[in-house]
Amino acid sequence: LECHNQQSSQTPTTKTCSGETNCYKKWWSDHRGTIIERGCGCPKVKPGVNLNCCRRDRCNN
């Protein structure tokens, strides 16, 4: 599985995720604006953090 791993609005980069079945994108807002984090897996998130998990290559941009 290949997942995007760039932060927020940086140039898209990807990572090969051995043994993973999901990519994720999570985002939240703070004093800097909207922060977006992407990567492999499907993590648990705190209340107030939005999470989208998906199962296709590069589906988390």
Swiss-Prot record:
Keyword field contains Disulfide bond: yes
Name of the featured protein: Cobrotoxin-b
GO cellular component, one term: extracellular region
Family: Belongs to the three-finger toxin family. Short-chain subfamily. Type I alpha-neurotoxin sub-subfamily.
Tissue: Expressed by the venom gland.
Top-level taxon of origin: Eukaryota
Residues under site feature: May be the main cause for the toxicity difference between this toxin and cobrotoxin-c: 56
Record's keyword terms, sorted: Disulfide bond, Ion channel impairing toxin, Neurotoxin, Postsynaptic neurotoxin, Secreted, Toxin
Lineage, uppermost ranks: Eukaryota, Metazoa, Chordata, Craniata, Vertebrata
The UniProt record lists the keyword rRNA-binding: no
Molecular function GO terms recorded: ion channel regulator activity; toxin activity
Intrachain S-S bonds: 3-23, 17-40, 42-53, 54-59
SUPFAM superfamilies for this protein: Snake toxin-like (SSF57302)
Compartments in which it is found: Secreted
Note: It inhibits muscle contraction with an IC(50) of 0.23 ug/ml.
Free-text function comment from the UniProt entry: Produces peripheral paralysis by blocking neuromuscular transmission at the postsynaptic site. Binds to the nicotinic acetylcholine receptor.
Pfam families linked: Toxin_cobra-type (PF21947)
Residue stretches spanning the membrane: none
Main location: secreted
